[in-house]
Amino acid sequence: MKIDLNADLGEGCASDAELLTLVSSANIACGFHAGDAQTMQACVREAIKNGVAIGAHPSFPDRENFGRSAMQLPPETVFAQTLYQIGALAAITRAQGGVMCHVKPHGMLYNQAAKEAQLADAIARAVYACDPALILVGLAGSELIRAGERYGLVTREEVFADRGYQADGSLVPRSQPGALIENEEQALAQTLEMVQHGRVKSITGEWAMVTAQTVCLHGDGEHALAFARRLRATFAEKGIVVAA
């Protein structure tokens, strides 16, 4: 069994360099919620050094709230903003002799695109316009995954080690109790259940079916590095190969 392990990087966390030795894919902030040209360049350099797959992590234009504010923007605006961000990272990656492999939206752009078909379509269209060979990463079973498939993109369905799930397979909003899993044992058990058995227990007790092709580790979590090491060790024990 193989699984991709990804982390959101270039967002100002001190643990980026170490996380890049533990993950197989990096989603690099492109300036709209965090990061800038220098951090993008530094993250790309480290990712190439560690053999980690490079991806763009575009966001709504919301540095003030770290891309976590809901926005209702015209699809053409979202298309242009997404293309702008992924194009910038693609150029920075190419300039350093690397290849950009995937795109994963950030924060509220990701969450809204999971449910809003027009928004999902604008993102998928931007990815396709930039490079049809790019992989589109989205919440398992979401509108974003369906939009990517409509454009003929390779999609990668994502699950979260440290997030609570609702009965419909969507994430519990960060504003609600149960959104974040702080207990390491619980996060580890949830991850293995999703990867090995394709299901996750919701905060209300029901099982939701999920397709786990990539697992997200949040690099900004307090125990991110320790948990990443433990997850890698557990995967190795279970014969699960970590690779993009």
Curated annotation (Swiss-Prot):
SUPFAM superfamilies xref list: Glycoside hydrolase/deacetylase (SSF88713)
EC number: 3.5.2.9
Chemical reaction(s) catalysed: 5-oxo-L-proline + ATP + 2 H2O = L-glutamate + ADP + phosphate + H(+)
InterPro entries tied to this protein: Glyco_hydro/deAcase_b/a-brl (IPR011330), LamB/YcsF/PxpA-like (IPR005501)
Record keywords, A-Z: ATP-binding, Hydrolase, Nucleotide-binding
CDD domains, per database record: LamB_YcsF_YbgL_like (cd10800)
Function: Catalyzes the cleavage of 5-oxoproline to form L-glutamate coupled to the hydrolysis of ATP to ADP and inorganic phosphate.
Record protein name field: 5-oxoprolinase subunit A
Organism per entry: Escherichia coli O6:H1 (strain CFT073 / ATCC 700928 / UPEC)
